[in-house]
């Protein structure tokens, strides 16, 4: 399964509610992900631009997006961003594949301005 990192902010109303009645939100997120075949790897309260960070596994992007939308539909979340995370093994494979593709790719403008293709690919 693919690993995703999501970050977001709580609304002021959500912060007021959780301050009045603290609760472990990781349980709700874990249940939401499990309902679609995903898994919560970690949930963290964070400092800075975002209030929380979630690391999760999901079968595919559509499935992950459905969980984000379901959580956001409650109105307590905002400014959500999600990133796909690749393992070290997947990264090595991606760079290997990129190396093969780069040999076949013609850079924009490579045939113009007298720049040989070999040099343009190194720019």
Regions found by a protein language model. Give the residues of each.
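A compositional/biophysical signature of low hydrophobicity enriched in polar/charged and small residues
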Residues: 1-123
């Amino acid at each position: 399964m693919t690993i995703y990192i999501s970050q977001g902010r709580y609304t002021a109303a959500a912060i007021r509610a959780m301050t009045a009645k603290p609760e472990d939100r990781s349980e709700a997120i874990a249940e939401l992900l499990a309902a679609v075949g995903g898994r919560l790897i970690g949930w963290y309260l964070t400092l800075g631009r975002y209030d929380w960070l979630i690391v999760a596994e999901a079968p595919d992007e559509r499935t992950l997006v459905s969980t984000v939308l379901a959580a956001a539909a409650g109105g307590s979340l905002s400014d959500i961003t999600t990133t796909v995370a690749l393992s070290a093994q997947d990264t090595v494979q991606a760079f290997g594949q990129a190396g093969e593709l780069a040999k076949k790719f013609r850079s924009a403008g490579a045939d113009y301005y007298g720049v040989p293709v070999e040099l343009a690919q190194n720019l």
